């Protein structure tokens, strides 16, 4: 079961919500997220023919800011250097005190946060994918406004968070939108013709993240975009590529891509590429040592890995090893709910993880700039 995050009314991303909390207090943000979780618990109980009073434990994961706001903790420590979470261990709490109307002795279970922008949701991914128990080295990437990554195996794990920006979630893109009905989700240039699909087979209304990456990749591979990201002339309007004209769209503007949109994609993919490179450097390994690449989250499930590799988001050598894993954070929360020993083990794993602070890395800027160009 899912709902749109009600906190979006206070800010489009976690940074804006954190700023709102610092200026106006956490009460509004805390109240609305607790209420929606409690409402969904009631809906799930009704669908199962049970009472919420039968629920004895609830496991919750989320990014560090969401984690703090759910608990009613100020996110002040997350927006000021050194960007450390206020709490970094797993918690077992009284659920009723946090607005969840379950069994009167019901427990709220929270996996630990790792760093300021690597949260309990990343712990859930590690737990679901068993990265900390594998002999082979794997890379997990959860692409969103912050691109969280974990690289390693049972011997050593390193993680980081890159400010990928909201482009892949449809923000800051002229015709961008979330992955809803009418969003162009896949694009192919074939035999001189543009083909695309939309979510729900509705009239095209905009570009969601997967469609955006496909479109940029296809434009680059077909020679409409050069290595620097410059959109070649030839369109009716300079610096604009029209995929769907207004008369064929579900709106009066059509679906198109601007030069600025391409720049936003370059910024996002360069941040992810730089994060991967610096994690490999920290562990002193190369692409050939990475045996699996897990793409977590809803976006990773729908993104075409070939398009991501084509624009340089991932090293091309990793393409055959890429595996979408869907809602790994949610699966990790389920495992944590059912296994106390796994929760304890995750606390130990987090304490031993190597967090790479990209903002403090003298090499990050060079890697980032190198990653702006298309390969």
Where are these regions (language model features)?
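Phosphate/ATP-binding catalytic cores across multiple sugar-kinase/actin-like superfamilies
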Residues: 36-48, 122-125, 129, 266-288
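Glycine-rich phosphate-binding loop of actin/hexokinase-like ATP-binding domains
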Residues: 1-13, 76-90, 124-211, 304-326
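Short glycine-rich phosphate-binding loop at a beta-alpha junction
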Residues: 50-63, 216, 288-297
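Catalytic phosphate/nucleotide-handling subdomain of diverse soluble enzymes
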Residues: 153-155, 285-349
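A contiguous, well-structured pocket-lining segment that forms one wall/lid of small-molecule binding clefts
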Residues: 220-283
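N-terminal glycine/serine-rich phosphate-binding loop of ATP-dependent small-molecule kinases
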Residues: 1-71, 77-79, 109
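Acidic, glycine/GT-rich loop-and beta-edge segments that sit at the periphery of enzyme/chaperone cores
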Residues: 107-122, 335-375
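Short glycine/threonine-rich loop-to-helix capping motif typified by GTGT followed
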Residues: 63-77, 285-288, 297-316, 358-367
């Amino acid at each position: 079961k899912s709902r749109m995050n009600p906190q979006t009314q206070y800010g489009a991303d976690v940074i804006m919500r954190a700023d709102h909390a610092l200026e106006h207090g956490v009460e509004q943000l805390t109240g609305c997220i607790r209420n929606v979780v409690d409402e969904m618990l009631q809906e799930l109980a009704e669908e199962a023919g049970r009472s919420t009073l039968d629920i004895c434990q609830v496991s919750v994961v989320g990014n560090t800011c969401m984690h703090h706001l759910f608990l009613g903790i100020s996110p002040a420590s997350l927006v000021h250097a050194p960007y450390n979470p206020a709490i970094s261990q797993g918690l077992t709490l009284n659920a009723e005190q946090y607005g969840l109307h379950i069994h009167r002795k019901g427990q709220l279970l929270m996996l630990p946060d790792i760093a300021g922008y690597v949260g309990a949701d990343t712990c859930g991914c590690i737990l679901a994918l068993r990265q900390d128990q594998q002999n082979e080295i794997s890379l997990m990437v959860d692409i969103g406004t912050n691109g969280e990554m974990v690289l390693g195996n049972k011997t050593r794990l390193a993680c980081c968070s890159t400010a990928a920006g909201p482009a892949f979630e449809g923000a800051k893109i002229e015709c961008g939108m979330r992955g809803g009905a009418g969003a162009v989700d896949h694009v192919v240039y074939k035999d001189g013709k543009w083909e695309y699909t939309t979510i729900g087979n509705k009239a095209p209304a905009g570009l969601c993240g997967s469609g955006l990456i496909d479109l940029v990749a296809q434009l680059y591979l077909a020679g409409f975009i050069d290595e620097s990201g410059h959109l070649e002339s030839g369109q009716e309007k300079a610096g604009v590529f029209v995929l769907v004209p207004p008369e064929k769209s579900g709106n009066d503007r059509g679906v198109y891509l601007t030069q600025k949109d391409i720049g936003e994609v370059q910024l996002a993919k360069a941040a992810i590429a730089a994060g991967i490179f610096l994690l490999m450097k920290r562990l002193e390994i190369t692409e050939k040592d990475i045996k699996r690449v897990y793409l977590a989250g809803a976006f990773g499930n729908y993104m075409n890995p070939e398009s991501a590799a084509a624009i340089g988001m991932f090293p091309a050598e990793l393409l055959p090893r890429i595996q979408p894993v869907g809602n790994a954070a949610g699966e990790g929360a389920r495992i944590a709910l059912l296994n106390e020993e796994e929760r304890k083990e995750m606390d130990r794993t987090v304490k031993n993880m190597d967090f790479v602070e990209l903002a403090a890395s003298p090499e990050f800027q060079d890697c980032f700039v190198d990653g702006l160009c298309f390969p």
